[in-house]
């Protein structure tokens, strides 16, 4: 039994001796110093005045802004809905950072409603993964004037 174990151990050691471990960063932006919004407006003939603020996920360590943000724009725009993707700061121990960024996004979208041809009373929020947590936090804990309509 000892010999089988030793043989198996050395066989595995030999097989993995050439294995190289390479550290990779998770996809998406890191160390966002300044939050930002990217606005995707529908064609004027399709526009309904409705908008959705999208909060991408990423486990509060990075943002998956492409597949959980920007890639949704054509879907919403074809339905006449503006999509506004929020790049929020990572908390790094301060949970108020992403919350304040999302609250500011809601205020900016409402304040810019005339410029973007939006109805300030028809602004929603959505998110994926950690972004979904952020969206639900804004929907339930923000001051009433900063909460989404849906």
Regions found by a protein language model. Give the residues of each.
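Active-site glycine-rich loops that stabilize anionic/oxyanionic intermediates
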Residues: 56-61, 129
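Short beta-strand-to-loop junctions in surface cap/lid or active-site-entrance loops
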Residues: 36-48, 114-116
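Primarily recognizes the serine-hydrolase "nucleophile elbow" in alpha/beta-hydrolase
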Residues: 104-150
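Short beta-strand element of the alpha/beta-hydrolase
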Residues: 48-57
């Amino acid at each position: 039994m000892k010999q089988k174990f030793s043989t198996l151990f050395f066989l595995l050691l030999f097989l993995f001796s050439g294995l190289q471990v390479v550290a990779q960063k998770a996809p998406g932006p890191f160390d966002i110093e300044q939050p930002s919004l990217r606005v995707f407006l529908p064609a004027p003939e399709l526009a309904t005045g409705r908008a959705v603020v999208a909060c991408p996920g990423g486990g509060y360590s990075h943002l998956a802004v492409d597949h959980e943000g920007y890639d949704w724009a054509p879907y919403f725009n074809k339905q006449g809905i503006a999509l506004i993707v929020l790049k929020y700061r990572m908390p790094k121990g301060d949970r108020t950072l992403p919350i304040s960024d999302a609250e500011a996004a809601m205020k900016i979208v409402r304040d810019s409603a005339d410029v973007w041809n939006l109805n300030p009373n028809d602004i929603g929020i959505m998110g994926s993964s950690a972004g979904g947590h952020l969206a639900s936090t804004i929907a339930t804990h923000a001051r009433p004037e900063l909460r989404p309509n849906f």
